[in-house]
């Protein structure tokens, strides 16, 4: 808990396990038993992230759109704090400078509250706000085209946002999770200090599941034992082993996270 840290908001709170996995591998208060207790009463891993319940969670999310909208407030508060206590420092050189990162989906963008908050963010020139939109085109009712067909990047450009598109589907021809491409887009967004940024990240939901990837069947219900076994095979895991986490891997990731955190904290 230090004021110069970046903030991360998982606006798609139902994807909480992706956050819990990162906290586990970083050694940030979660152990394997906590992952095994996902969505059970009293566990540290509830169905949606809860602030002050699980270490490393910046805010409670769940109602779609709440995370992105609140992140706009976080970005405004950060700028206000800097203006009060360190207004003279060049951009990027104040101990109060940090970014607010948000991951959200179509469900967040369909909500009116995000339209209002995003318009405000553009008007306020919140260059410390970076929103990654997981564009998988799937809702619980299958293809989002039945209810959501607008030009999102065009709308956000009209709000005054900086826009980028990273297409992991390569136009629907081949799926490749180009992490470097996403990283480079984030770095470009960091350079734009007079506008908030949105990165459209085109993905395939539930990839590489054998039969349910890219379908509504993978959105709001369990995959099932057969599908999970196929997924494990596709990823090179033993389909008979649950929660594989080699001790040497966990030791490495936690040491690496600690080293990077100490370096960032020291620079701050």
Question: Where are the model-predicted features located?
Answer:
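Cofactor-binding active-site loop characterized by glycine-rich and histidine/acidic residues
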Residues: 1-124
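Short acidic/polar active-site loop segments enriched in Thr and Asp
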Residues: 127
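Conserved acidic/glycine
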Residues: 1, 12, 88-93, 98, ...
């Amino acid at each position: 808990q230090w004021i110069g840290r970046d903030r991360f908001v998982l606006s798609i709170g139902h994807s909480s396990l992706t956050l819990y996995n990162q906290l586990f591998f970083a050694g940030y208060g979660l152990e394997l038993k906590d992952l095994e207790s996902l969505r059970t009463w009293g566990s540290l891993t509830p169905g949606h992230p809860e602030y002050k319940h699980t270490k490393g969670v910046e805010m409670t999310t769940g109602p779609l759109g709440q995370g992105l909208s609140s992140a706009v407030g976080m970005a405004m508060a950060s700028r206000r704090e800097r203006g009060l206590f360190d207004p003279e420092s060049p951009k990027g050189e104040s101990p109060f400078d940090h970014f607010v990162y948000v991951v959200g989906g179509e469900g967040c963008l369909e909500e009116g509250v995000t339209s209002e908050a995003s318009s405000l963010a553009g008007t306020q020139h919140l260059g410390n706000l970076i929103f990654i939109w997981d564009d998988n085109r799937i809702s619980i009712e299958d293809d989002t085209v039945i209810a959501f067909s607008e030009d999102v990047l065009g709308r956000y450009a009209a709000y005054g946002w900086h826009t980028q598109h990273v297409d992991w589907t390569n136009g629907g021809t081949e799926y490749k999770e180009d992490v470097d491409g996403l990283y480079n887009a984030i770095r470009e967004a960091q350079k734009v200090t007079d506008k908030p940024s949105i990165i459209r990240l085109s993905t395939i939901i539930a990839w590489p599941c054998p039969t349910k990837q890219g379908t509504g069947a993978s959105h709001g219900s369990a995959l099932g034992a057969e599908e999970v076994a196929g997924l494990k095979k596709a990823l090179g895991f033993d389909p008979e082993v649950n929660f594989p986490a080699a001790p040497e891997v966990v030791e490495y990731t936690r040491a690496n996270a600690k080293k990077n955190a100490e370096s960032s904290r020291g620079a701050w």
